[in-house]
């Protein structure tokens, strides 16, 4: 059996959207699971819409997700001459022909089809015209001489057997009148030349599969195995769109998701292995196959993604998480402000705070928000809830504790011993003093455990913040 070769072939007209990322992941996993290769092709034939920025975003998105490819990136536009050679071959076989229909004639065909309530199709008027009738004042398009009877059958690894009556498929354009190849042709020639054995893509390409199969047959080439995976829908069941929220992989990165978590979430969008939800990359590769991909659309669930991300954050080592936070900061809107405040001392405080922070946060941005107390400058701006907690009685408790804290062994355990002893001596519950301490130290009513905050901020800064609220 020949080596499995898959490909991911995005068009660089925007960011790497979440559906494309899942398609790339499925291709990557299938190749890895079968001991094969995944190739990357940039389908940049739309010169107006294809941009270098979009190409960079795709490459960066794949790299961030941990999806690598084999060999050099293939650029479709650079292969236009090869695409034209394939058309010459079809012309010589009699499987393609020049068509001189004018734009006006094509409009008339469309209008007639609309009136008769049928899909617009080219009527084949130049299919069998003799060369003597060809006009000399305009250049033709080149069309495929598609079969008009029978059916084109796709044996799809996800959708099963899909049959297309050939009468419903017209003679599609292979080369435009200016000599540029169409997408439909370029895809077939590139997949053949790249040795692609398996095409895995969204089921919005299913009709394309029938047309492309006809091109393969016209060239006498083997047709790769195809698998058309269902699209991703929003939580409301509609096709995933901008109104459902973030779409690009870069947006999920900037929202503080970990690549391993997003990878894990994406693999479960349409594929399953029993009831297992959390997969290491090794487990994905071990278990992935197309027979476990469903036919119905998968719904994107942000809450589930958050929960999976929270799991990966808690499972990450503090060193890994610190690196992830440092990697995220340059991509945040206030990156310059954050980086300016990121002194060596504060970086060490952030490292020290991570064990407590990661237990509460579901994303890196939530974690950074929870760490804001480290970067706050005195006197702290108090949130409304924190102001409400710092009553006159609460401030009096803080003032009474300061001398005892000044003498404490400065650690989470040491400060906890002092505060618990004070609460017992004062005849109040621990929360009655711990919550005001939290508000005075962080300006908020939510934070990592208050004794961890003492340890992270250190003796001098902690006592100074407490004194600010009792002055």
From Swiss-Prot:
GO terms for molecular function: ATP binding; glutamate-tRNA ligase activity; tRNA binding; zinc ion binding. A motif ('HIGH' region) lies at residues 10-20. A motif ('KMSKS' region) lies at residues 239-243. Residues 117-137 are annotated as: Disordered. GO terms for cellular component: cytosol. It is found in: Cytoplasm. CDD domains: GluRS_core. GO terms for biological process: glutamyl-tRNA aminoacylation. HAMAP family: Glu_tRNA_synth_type1. Monomer. Catalyzes the attachment of glutamate to tRNA(Glu) in a two-step reaction: glutamate is first activated by ATP to form Glu-AMP and then transferred to the acceptor end of tRNA(Glu). This is Glutamate--tRNA ligase. It comes from Azorhizobium caulinodans (strain ATCC 43989 / DSM 5975 / JCM 20966 / LMG 6465 / NBRC 14845 / NCIMB 13405 / ORS 571).
């Amino acid at each position: 059996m020949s080596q499995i070769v898959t490909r991911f072939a995005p068009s660089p007209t925007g960011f790497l959207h979440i559906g494309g990322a899942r398609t790339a992941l499925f291709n990557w996993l299938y190749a890895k699971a079968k001991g094969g290769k995944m190739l990357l092709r940039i389908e940049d034939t739309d010169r107006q819409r294809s941009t270098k920025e979009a190409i960079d975003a795709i490459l960066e998105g794949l790299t961030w997700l941990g999806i690598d490819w084999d060999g050099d990136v293939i650029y479709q536009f650079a292969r236009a001459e090869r695409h034209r050679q394939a058309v010459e071959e079809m012309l010589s076989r009699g499987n393609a022909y020049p068509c001189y229909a004018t734009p006006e004639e094509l409009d008339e065909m469309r209008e007639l089809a609309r009136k008769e309530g049928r899909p617009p199709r080219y009527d084949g008027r130049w299919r069998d015209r003799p060369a003597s009738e060809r006009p000399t004042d305009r250049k033709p398009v080149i069309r495929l001489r598609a079969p008009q009877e029978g059916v084109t059958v796709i044996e799809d690894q996800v959708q099963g057997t899909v049959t297309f009556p050939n009468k419903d498929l017209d003679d599609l354009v292979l080369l435009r009148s200016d000599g540029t190849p169409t997408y439909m042709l370029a895809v077939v020639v590139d997949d053949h030349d790249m040795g692609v054995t398996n095409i895995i893509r969204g089921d919005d390409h299913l009709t394309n599969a029938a047309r492309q199969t006809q091109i393969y047959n016209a060239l006498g080439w083997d047709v790769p195995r195809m698998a058309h995976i269902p699209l991703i829908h929003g939580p409301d069941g509609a096709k995933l769109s901008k109104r459902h929220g973030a779409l690009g992989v870069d947006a999920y990165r900037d929202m503080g998701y970990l690549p391993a978590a997003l990878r894990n979430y994406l693999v479960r969008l349409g594929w399953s292995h029993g009831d297992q939800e959390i997969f290491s990359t090794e487990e994905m590769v071990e278990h992935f196959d197309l027979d476990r991909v469903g036919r119905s659309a998968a719904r994107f669930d942000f809450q589930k993604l958050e929960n999976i991300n929270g799991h990966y954050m808690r499972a990450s080592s503090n060193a890994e998480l610190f690196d992830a936070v440092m990697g995220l900061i340059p991509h945040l809107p206030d990156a310059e402000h954050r980086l300016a405040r990121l002194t060596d001392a504060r970086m060490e405080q952030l490292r020290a705070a991570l064990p407590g922070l990661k237990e509460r946060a579901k994303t890196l941005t939530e974690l950074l928000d929870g760490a804001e107390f480290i970067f706050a400058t005195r006197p702290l701006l108090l949130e409304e809830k924190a102001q409400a907690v710092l009553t006159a009685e609460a401030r009096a408790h803080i003032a009474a504790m300061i001398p005892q804290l000044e003498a404490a062994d400065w650690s989470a355990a040491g400060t906890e011993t002092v505060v618990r002893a004070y609460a017992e001596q004062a005849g109040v519950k621990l929360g009655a003093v711990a919550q005001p301490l939290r508000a005075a130290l962080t300006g908020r009513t939510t934070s990592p455990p208050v004794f961890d905050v003492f340890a992270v901020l250190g003796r001098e800064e902690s006592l100074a913040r407490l004194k600010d609220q009792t002055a």
